[in-house]
Amino acid sequence: MKKKIIIDTDPAMGTKGGDPEDCFAIMLALNSPEIEVLGITTVQGNVPVERGYSNAKFLVEELNKEIPVHTGKPGTYDEKRNSKRLWLAGREEMEQITPMIVPLENEASAESFIAKTCKNNSGDIELVTIGPLTNVAKALDEDPNLNKHIN
């Protein structure tokens, strides 16, 4: 039986000077015979959330996979602490190597996708978080009992 996962990530692949490790993890998971990736959610971290979505969507399309990608909201969990971190300053201006892909307006948010998918696969799903935990925190806000559905 394949292990069901959601990957929550801040992939900088496709951004000149960005870190590629999240994308390597995504590629390994998407091509593993032991893993079923139910979806990918993006969070602000190494790059702005919109850039992370574009990078993840581009990667999924290049690998010819039918995996949904959902974007989180820009910013951090605590809006009072939503200032740029020093190491992130200037990343918005980084040269984009891959094309920019914009999410559909009616697409579910990352936190809603996480909450719904975990409930629909109660006890059989694992969250693979390789970025800040903003989307997971917001999903727990949406459903405080969500942790009971995650393996």
Predicted regions and their residues:
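Active-site histidine-anchored catalytic micro-motif
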Residues: 1-39, 43-57, 92, 96-151
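Short, hinge-like loop/turn segments at secondary-structure boundaries
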Residues: 56-59, 86-88
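A glycine-rich helix N-cap at a beta->alpha junction
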Residues: 59-73
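Surface-exposed loop and adjacent secondary-structure segments within mature catalytic domains
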Residues: 70-98
